[in-house]
């Protein structure tokens, strides 16, 4: 792209130079010969009339020599010497090789004639610098007819009557209401296995209901059927139930309105197999919830047999899940 711009720039410069050269050549060709010659050539020439005066009205200096002093010219004071006359005398001595002729002893002063009479009578009229070929440019004459511009005729718009279209009654399309999505009810059948986790208080302590309720709400548990808490597919508490949490003490229910006065030895989290969704993902959520409750309330996580939760126990639960897949 840069090379293309450079080529265009060079072409433009060459075109401009060509136009300028052609213009100067055309102007030079149309000029008369008098324009081509220097107009100062004739002025620089020394012209003298019949009485010996040049264009400035200055005559040639006449040198008067004494008969007794032939070899010594008469000196003239610097104040009386005319600079133009001095230059003329100097040029005359340099160009002329012959000695000046002797004249009478008396000094003859040049008679000064008014310049107006000289120029009026004897001085030839100086020709025009441009000669007869002087170019006269005629100014354009503006006539009244040219000034008076005829008003343009106004064109009247021609409106063609459009054919009137008969109104067509547009019937609105019937609004098709989307059919309500029918929840896919999967028949899980009878549960074949149950995964159980216990969160119990330490020896001599109890789990406080005032601390348990905020923890359950943070973990997206929702109080529901059978008066226990459930964990649903959606965090807002909608969808299928993934797993549930009950009170470890009989009858195993909760009273949300009296949770501040509630206390228990522990809670139990359980998940049936098969279940809705991915069983491994559901078990991972249940295990993390159990650990979070134990950390917030100061409890301990145990397995279904109320034994200490170990990594081997976790692997055993995973194998049970895969067996039911």
Curated annotation (Swiss-Prot):
The chain crosses the membrane at residues 7-27. Residues 1-6 are periplasmic. The keyword Phosphoprotein does not apply. Its main location: membrane. It comes from the Bacteria. Residues 28-325 are cytoplasmic. Belongs to the ZipA family. Essential cell division protein that stabilizes the FtsZ protofilaments by cross-linking them and that serves as a cytoplasmic membrane anchor for the Z ring. Also required for the recruitment to the septal ring of downstream cell division proteins. This is Cell division protein ZipA. It comes from Shewanella pealeana (strain ATCC 700345 / ANG-SQ1). The lineage of its organism: Bacteria, Pseudomonadati, Pseudomonadota, Gammaproteobacteria, Alteromonadales. The gene is zipA.
């Amino acid at each position: 792209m840069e090379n293309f711009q450079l080529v265009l720039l060079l072409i433009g410069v060459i075109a401009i130079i060509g136009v300028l050269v052609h213009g100067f050549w055309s102007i030079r060709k149309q000029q008369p010969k008098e324009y081509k010659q220097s107009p100062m050539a004739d002025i620089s020439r020394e012209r003298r009339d019949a009485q010996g005066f040049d264009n400035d009205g200055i005559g040639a200096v006449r040198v008067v020599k004494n008969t007794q002093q032939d070899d010594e010219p008469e000196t003239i004071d610097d104040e009386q010497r005319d600079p133009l006359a001095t230059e003329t005398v100097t040029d005359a001595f340099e160009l002329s090789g012959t000695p000046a002729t002797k004249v009478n002893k008396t000094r003859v002063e040049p008679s000064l004639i008014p310049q107006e009479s000289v120029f009026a009578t004897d001085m030839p009229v100086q020709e025009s610098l441009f000669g007869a070929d002087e170019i006269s440019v005629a100014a354009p004459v503006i006539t009244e007819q040219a000034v008076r511009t005829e008003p343009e005729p106004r064109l009247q718009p021609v409106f063609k009557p459009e054919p009137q279209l008969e109104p067509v009654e547009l019937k609105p399309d019937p609004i098709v209401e989307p059919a309500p999505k029918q929840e896919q009810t999967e028949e899980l059948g009878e549960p074949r296995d149950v995964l159980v986790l216990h969160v119990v208080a330490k020896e001599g302590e109890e789990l406080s209901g005032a601390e348990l309720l905020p923890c359950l709400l943070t973990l997206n548990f929702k109080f529901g059927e059978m008066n226990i808490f459930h964990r649903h597919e959606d965090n807002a508490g909608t969808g299928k139930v993934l797993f549930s949490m009950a009170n470890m003490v009989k009858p195993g229910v909760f009273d949300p309105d009296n949770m501040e006065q509630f206390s228990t030895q522990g809670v139990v989290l359980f998940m049936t197999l098969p279940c809705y969704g991915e069983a491994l993902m559901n078990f991972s959520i249940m295990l993390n919830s159990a650990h979070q409750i134990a950390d917030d309330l100061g409890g301990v996580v145990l397995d279904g047999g109320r034994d200490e939760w170990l990594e081997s126990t976790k692997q055993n639960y995973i194998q049970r899940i895969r067996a039911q897949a």
